[in-house]
Amino acid sequence: MNMSDRHLAELVVDLDAIAHNVRVFQEAAAPAGVMAVVKADAYNHGVDVVAPAMLDAGVEQLGVATLGEALHLRGSLNDLGERYHSTPITAWMWMPGDELADVFAAGITVGVPSLAHAKSLVEQAERALRETQVSAPVRASLMVDTGLSRSGVSPAEWQQTVELLAAHTDCVDITGVMSHMASADEPQSEANDLQATRFAQAIEFCRNHGLPVPCNHIANTPATLNRPDLAYELVRPGVGLYGIDPAGAGVELRPAMTLRARVITTRVVPKGEGVSYSHTWRAQRDTRTAVVALGYADGLPRSVSGKMQVTINGKVYPQIGRVCMDQIVVELGPADDTEAETSAVQPGDWAVIFGEVGTSIDEFAELAGTISYEVLTMPRGPRIARVFRGGKPDFSGDGSRTVATADDMRHLGEQLGAQLEAGTVVVLSGPLGAGKTTLTQGLAAGLGVKGRVQSPTFTIVRTHRAGQRGIGLLHMDAYRLLGADVDEGIEPGRHIDRNEVLDALESLDIDADIDDVVVVAEWGRGVVEPLSDKVLDVQIDRGSVSGAADAASEIRTVTWHWG
């Protein structure tokens, strides 16, 4: 039996949150493209799943640290199908003596951080072309040290490195210049303007010496959000794509990671007894406790002992005593407490350490005396199962999805529209204000039709001409099409056939061929199903974090099934 079959802890990764964050950075960077940094296993989120999810969301390129990461990523993407094969991947950490033949063959763009690296690259690229291992110049990105003093060609080596690479454009294609900000999370730092000036000078120097450098990038997460002047042709965000805003830019990023573990037992600790090693906590009264299956062997730092809180069934409880190798203890409350929250915690319940509820990643980082970047990479080891939620939905079968914002609803609609065929009837149901028209706006974008999608409140039926896909859209309020009231619906027992619906459309001078369009019918249940044998019923319901319907909440559950 695989260990993960009996796992007691999970790292839950929300792919919808990642897609949302990608869209935030696309909007901030436009018209520049986005290179997503997916080093360190996508900041511990699982690169094999996260990278294609980012590409599906609109990321143009991927960046990693090491050549090993790059080769793994290329193989993983190749396994997913042809549409991912040509994804540009850049890696910037390697040694001058490393053999690069397999890197060249995989089409990886290598970063050049020193003169020694440039010499090694030129030598190996010349040999690869001479021996026909490659048929075109190999791709590289010239790294310049603008002030971080870590990686990047130093000022002392800069001219010689540029001249060397400019003399060997027959075997090395320098795609651009890249650098890294030292203090972009401190917008007022003078270092930012200094690095910006040096980067612009480096690009100009390259172009004056015969290197066109068409694709340049220096903006990390905070620079993308705070310094639009540094967008250039690409931005290169990392931690922000996973929902962390290190500069407090105020954008609506959604953290994608939740760490949780099972409660394995509960007990009553008598007054005066100690808990965990060295008895750093003692019961001041008879106290009910729970043991949670997570410890420092799983990446939970001992430094948070007695400081952290966990969330179980929506209620926050303090962790007590020392963090152990495999487990922690949580105080539930007085043993004689008859409140449901105290006694309701049972073995098998999930205790959330940080993430979607309770303690945020930023708050946990403060408790641990570190930064959110490190917290993301803390959970580790085979005892924690990585679980993915959301991602690109498959509308070929029945399913459901929870969306948090109107933008997410449009994006879901766009994914739906991209998968629909001509002749499909989509029946949209849900209360007023649920988001039916918002979903339709996204669906229209996925179909690529012409014209602005508006609510059918005033115009009962609206046609949208086909775009490149050759599929049009017919958007209607189906109840009003047949003279019914939304609140009352279709009269009980009334039978509606295909001809009645077509006659109603013809009476409004709508002459679209149903087989050439997608029909989206708001309030369409019991009305438009006779139009096609391909009917997708979509229900939108309001929701909230607690699960109860909440008119003020943007959270929606979208459920679909084929009729």
Predicted feature residues:
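Active-site-proximal beta-alpha core segment in soluble small-molecule metabolic enzymes
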Residues: D5, E10-V12, A30-H217
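N-terminal pre-Walker A segment at the start of P-loop NTPase domains
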Residues: P393-Q415
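Short beta-strand-centered segment that lines the nucleotide-binding/catalytic pocket of NTP-utilizing
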Residues: V449-R465, M476
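Hydrophobic anchor at the beta1->P-loop junction of P-loop NTPases
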Residues: V426-L428
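Short phosphate-coordinating micro-motif centered on Lys-Gly-acidic
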Residues: D487-G563
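The conserved Walker
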Residues: L432
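Active-site anion/phosphate-binding pocket segments in diverse small-molecule metabolic enzymes
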Residues: M1-A19, E27, E69, M95-G97, ...
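Conserved lysine of the Walker
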Residues: K436
